[in-house]
Curated annotation (Swiss-Prot):
Cellular compartments per GO CC: cytoplasm
Protein name as catalogued: Phosphoribosylaminoimidazole-succinocarboxamide synthase
Name of the gene this protein is made from: purC
Family matches, as Pfam families: SAICAR_synt
UniProt family annotation: Belongs to the SAICAR synthetase family.
GO molecular function terms noted in the UniProt entry: ATP binding; phosphoribosylaminoimidazolesuccinocarboxamide synthase activity
Reaction equations catalysed: 5-amino-1-(5-phospho-D-ribosyl)imidazole-4-carboxylate + L-aspartate + ATP = (2S)-2-[5-amino-1-(5-phospho-beta-D-ribosyl)imidazole-4-carboxamido]succinate + ADP + phosphate + 2 H(+)
Recorded coiled-coil stretches: none
E.C. number(s) listed in UniProt: 6.3.2.6
GO biological process, one term: 'de novo' IMP biosynthetic process
EC main group: ligase
PROSITE patterns per UniProt: SAICAR_SYNTHETASE_1, SAICAR_SYNTHETASE_2
Organism whose genome encodes this protein: Corynebacterium diphtheriae (strain ATCC 700971 / NCTC 13129 / Biotype gravis)
Known pathway: Purine metabolism; IMP biosynthesis via de novo pathway; 5-amino-1-(5-phospho-D-ribosyl)imidazole-4-carboxamide from 5-amino-1-(5-phospho-D-ribosyl)imidazole-4-carboxylate: step 1/2
Keyword terms: ATP-binding, Ligase, Nucleotide-binding, Purine biosynthesis
């Protein structure tokens, strides 16, 4: 349910986030507990998910050396009490029309494309790679941003160049791969593999590239436990892949080819998903989730 924040104008809604205007220069981004998969918003919500995503984004915004969209602390006076801990005050930006994906391992849509063409978004890869193969080096695989309910479409780097120009496209690619590599090294120290992730960038009033939206959360990333890694198999994960696997497994009775919406998630899947999200936060940050602002109110 969308929070009714009467002091602000509601600007837009996504699958997970609600955006409100604070003033001429700032927005309030509120992260819900909604979870989406295969372009559907699922029922029921995952308890505490919005706070986990906000906590992880804040952690990485403060620990990754790159300009970001934050315009205030997590307890900024502009944040209403009812959304404290799952909202952040952000700068208004001109958002760029691409999801900037970095892949260090082959899985998901990247694996499917590789099996069909030997490439991912136009990047040629060696023969013989399988599920969860580590790539020789991380690759940049952009996608267009789809409207709510539509599919993001993987595109080649050339498409980014055509849309944004060579200099800006190179800047996007370099930033994406640098941030991914920095975060992957941090995760590795904590016994976790960052298989892939996606970023969104915008431009500030000076035309400077700024990291925005969410960053390195279990919604936007695939996190695998390093001690269970085995090439050629679907990996256990600390992200919403667990939900995707249940939806496409025999117990759900649903298929991605169905025209009907997915079924409601059973309580066991909801709780297991919450546990995975919380564990991802605690293992990567070294912090206790119960100490995050708003968790014990």
């Amino acid at each position: 349910m969308r929070p009714e924040l009467s002091q602000y104008t509601h600007v837009s809604a996504g699958k997970v986030r609600e955006i409100y205007e604070v003033d001429d220069e700032r927005l309030l981004m509120v992260v819900s507990d909604r979870i989406s998969a295969y372009d559907h918003i699922l029922e029921p919500e995952i308890p505490d998910k919005g706070r986990v995503l906000t906590a992880m984004s804040m952690y990485f915004f403060h620990n990754i050396d790159f300009p970001n969209h934050l315009a205030g602390p997590i307890d900024d006076p502009a944040i209403p009490e009812e959304v404290l801990g799952r909202a952040m005050v952000c700068k208004k930006l001109k958002m760029l029309p691409f999801e900037c994906v970095a892949r260090g391992y082959l899985t998901g849509s990247g694996l499917k494309e590789y099996q069909e063409t030997g490439t991912v978004c136009g990047v040629e890869l060696p023969e013989g790679l399988v599920e969860a193969s580590k790539l020789p080096e991380p690759i940049f695989t952009p996608a267009t941003k789809a409207e709510l309910g539509d599919h993001d479409e993987n595109v080649s780097f050339d498409v980014v160049v055509e849309k944004l120009g060579e200099a800006r496209a190179n800047e996007l690619r370099d930033a994406t791969l640098r941030i991914y590599s920095e975060a992957a090294a941090l995760a590795e120290e904590r016994g976790i593999i960052l298989a892939d992730t996606k970023f969104e960038f915008g431009l500030d009033e000076d035309g400077r590239l700024v990291l925005a939206d969410e960053v390195l959360t279990p919604d936007s990333s695939r996190y695998w436990p390093a001690d269970g890694y085995e090439e050629g198999k679907v990996q256990p994960s600390f992200d919403k892949q667990y939900v995707r696997n249940w939806l496409t497994g025999p117990k759900s009775g649903w298929s991605t080819d169905d025209v009907t919406p997915p079924p409601s998630l059973p309580g066991s899947v909801v709780e297991a998903t919450r546990e995975r999200y919380v564990e991802a936060f605690e293992r990567i940050t070294g912090k206790k989730f119960c100490e995050w602002i708003g968790c014990c109110v």
